[in-house]
């Protein structure tokens, strides 16, 4: 029998230091077949009337003596992209972007998000909401706005399963200074309002990720983790982040759109391996893959087991109980279940660090899948230009996105998309994470900028590519902006730097040419990319986030290189390649340390009619010509029977004039 993820009507409240009794997430009684194509979930760029939802939420807040309630974007595993049943912030606010935090008081409501979503949030939020543009001068953070609303000894509530323990502690300290208090609400209030309309929690089958793609047996990965535990003198590692579990066990799932992960937890000790996952997800083949050393336990039992695990922790030489280690992304609920900071060390995950450094098999897979993906993109752009210019066809943004997915699906090892395709024309290209919806999206204008940011999941890797084209005559400003963005992409692509350098330190390289003109973009320059895993992968990245300064780049890291420029209501430009860090030879070896550079793997032409060649240096012109020669060499063989695409590729990869 099918049933909805519906919370009980009685709500429990707990203070920061109190133990929690967590209810298991509801589960459907069936399993769906693992799919090999992706359903693309579109986003309405229209406002949703949230008055009734907010009224119901405030009534529940009143019943539970709450003055303020926080609704984060994340799920119980701190996933950036979530299953539809976990889209609570979207439900209560109407804002559909992937990042943001909603805060509701008895008299006001605010949503905080970053620069990728300023335009989208402004369009989607109704008059009940105040938009907090994160990072802008004079704009309160959501934590500051919460503290302001809670002044005078008020009570702030949050579901402890969807906020990290570190965030909860920091917010609690801030609130206590003003005489206020943070409490954890065991049953999510938004779930109460959503009720029977809340989507079912996915229960997809798990698949083995073969060694031919993984490159390393999962037993060796666990052995490496145990060495880390021995070095740190910890009793075990509690794994709560979904892509870390998928990577660690060489498994892939289908529980979250575009991300091949599955709902689970794991506990690794020097002697045991426990995987907390619904048994119905595991086929006999997967159980054989895991072997007898991996003990399968029910997904929801992690919280019940937590107390017992911490109670029987081995002793240190001094006789004190040894702590467990967990990621700094672990939820407040999980932390409290293990006994909090006294029993649990929260740190950057060693699994995350290891996963970010791809082995040679994974790197080869990333190279190979980007060649196939580049061929798919080339076929798409050739088709699109022919339809718009020669056939005078009328195509909307969704038509384009659907055609691109159709082309990709023909290629070897294709599984699905890695995120919603951003197919955007004219002013829509200025909406950084724009997602078109059939019926309300725009017709692609051949006389305007067209920006396409898209990616796919292949068995041997994950892709993410952005290209900006103009199929007619671009304006002088469009060409200038495009060329400045291109110069930034080249600057990062060709960077050479000593080992130990972080992505934080490299960010200015991609922005420098825009900065000289007084221009900039409100998003990071690059993010880590998984190997047939999440398209956004930590802990590395290129940008101004503080966490990017805490992790240096290493050979084997795979990141995006994607500077951009956007003029609201006019156009947007972004160029994105995927690049891999590697050791490079230099004339000298200052400090006797390795020096690193990048290898680009994206193989798709860069729109030449948008390049103002007079703004390029001799070296930059040579880079463009060399890049296009490489694209031709690696992808032209796909089009021996496709004259239209081959001719378009030849045109777009000619040396600059």
From Swiss-Prot:
Signal peptide boundaries: none
Annotated cofactor note: Binds 2 manganese ions per subunit.
Recorded GO CC terms: cytoplasm
GO biological process assignments: proteolysis
Catalytic activity: Release of any N-terminal amino acid, including proline, that is linked to proline, even from a dipeptide or tripeptide
EC numbers on record: 3.4.11.9
Record SUPFAM superfamilies: Creatinase/aminopeptidase, Creatinase/prolidase N-terminal domain
Function: Catalyzes the removal of a penultimate prolyl residue from the N-termini of peptides.
Protein name: Probable Xaa-Pro aminopeptidase P
Organism field: Talaromyces stipitatus (strain ATCC 10500 / CBS 375.48 / QM 6759 / NRRL 1006)
Top-level taxonomy: Eukaryota, Fungi, Dikarya, Ascomycota, Pezizomycotina
Name of the encoding gene: ampp
């Amino acid at each position: 029998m099918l049933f909805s993820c519906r919370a009980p009507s009685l709500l429990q409240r707990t203070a920061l230091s109190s133990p929690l009794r967590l209810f298991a997430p509801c589960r459907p009684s069936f399993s769906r077949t693992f799919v090999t194509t992706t359903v693309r979930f579109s986003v309405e760029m229209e406002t949703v009337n949230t008055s009734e939802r907010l009224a119901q939420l405030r009534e529940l807040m009143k019943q539970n003596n709450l003055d303020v309630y926080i609704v984060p974007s994340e799920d119980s595993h701190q996933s950036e992209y979530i299953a539809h049943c976990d889209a609570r912030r979207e439900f209560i606010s109407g804002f559909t972007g992937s990042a943001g935090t909603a805060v509701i008081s008895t008299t006001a409501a605010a949503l905080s998000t970053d620069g990728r979503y300023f335009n989208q949030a402004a369009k989607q939020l109704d008059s009940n909401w105040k938009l907090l543009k994160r990072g802008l001068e004079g704009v309160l953070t959501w934590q500051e706005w919460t503290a302001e609303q809670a002044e005078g000894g008020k009570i702030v509530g949050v579901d402890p399963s969807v906020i990290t323990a570190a965030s909860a502690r920091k917010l609690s300290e801030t609130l206590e200074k003003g005489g206020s208090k943070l409490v954890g609400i065991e049953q999510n209030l938004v779930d109460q309002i959503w009720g029977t309309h809340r989507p079912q929690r996915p229960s997809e089958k798990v698949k083995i990720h073969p060694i031919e793609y993984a490159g390393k047996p999962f037993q060796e990965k666990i052995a490496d983790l145990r060495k880390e535990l021995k070095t740190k003198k910890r009793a075990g590692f509690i794994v709560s982040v979904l892509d870390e579990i998928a990577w660690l066990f060489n498994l892939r799932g289908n529980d979250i759109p575009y991300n091949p992960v599955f709902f689970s937890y794991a506990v690794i000790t020097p002697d045991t391996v426990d995987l907390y996952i619904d048994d119905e997800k595991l086929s006999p083949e997967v159980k054989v893959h895991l072997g007898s050393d991996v003990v399968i336990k029910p997904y929801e039992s992690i919280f019940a087991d937590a107390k017992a695990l911490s109670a029987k922790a081995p002793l240190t030489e001094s006789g004190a109980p040894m702590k467990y280690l967990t990621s700094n992304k672990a939820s407040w609920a999980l932390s409290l279940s293990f006994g909090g900071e006294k029993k649990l060390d929260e740190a950057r995950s060693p699994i995350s660090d290891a996963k970010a450094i791809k082995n040679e098999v994974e790197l080869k897979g990333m190279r190979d899948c980007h060649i196939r993906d580049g061929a798919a993109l080339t076929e798409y752009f050739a088709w699109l230009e022919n339809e718009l210019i020669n056939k005078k066809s009328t195509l909307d943004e969704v038509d384009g996105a659907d055609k691109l997915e159709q082309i990709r699906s023909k290629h070897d090892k294709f599984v699905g998309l890695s995120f919603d395709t951003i197919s955007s024309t004219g002013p829509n290209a200025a909406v950084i994470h724009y997602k078109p919806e059939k019926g309300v999206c725009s017709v692609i204008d051949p006389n305007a900028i067209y920006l396409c940011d898209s990616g796919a999941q292949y068995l041997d890797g994950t892709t993410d590519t952005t290209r900006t084209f103009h199929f007619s005559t671009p304006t002088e400003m469009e060409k200038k902006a495009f060329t400045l963005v291109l110069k930034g992409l080249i600057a990062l692509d060709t960077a050479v730097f000593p080992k130990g350098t972080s992505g934080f330190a490299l960010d200015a390289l991609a922005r420098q040419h825009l900065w000289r003109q007084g221009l900039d973009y409100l998003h990071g320059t690059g993010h880590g990319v998984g190997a047939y895993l999440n398209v956004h992968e930590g802990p590395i990245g290129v940008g101004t986030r503080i966490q990017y300064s805490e992790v240096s780049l290493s050979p084997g890291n795979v990141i995006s290189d994607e500077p951009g420029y956007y003029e609201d209501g006019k156009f947007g430009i972004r160029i994105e390649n995927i690049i891999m860090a590697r050791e490079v030879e230099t004339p000298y070896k200052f400090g006797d340390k390795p020096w690193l550079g990048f290898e680009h793997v994206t193989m798709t032409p860069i729109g030449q009619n948008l390049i103002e060649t007079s703004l390029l240096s001799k070296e930059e012109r040579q880079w463009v010509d060399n890049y296009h020669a490489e694209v031709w060499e690696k992808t032209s063989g796909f089009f021996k029977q496709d004259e239209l695409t081959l001719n378009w590729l030849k045109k777009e990869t000619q040396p600059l004039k």
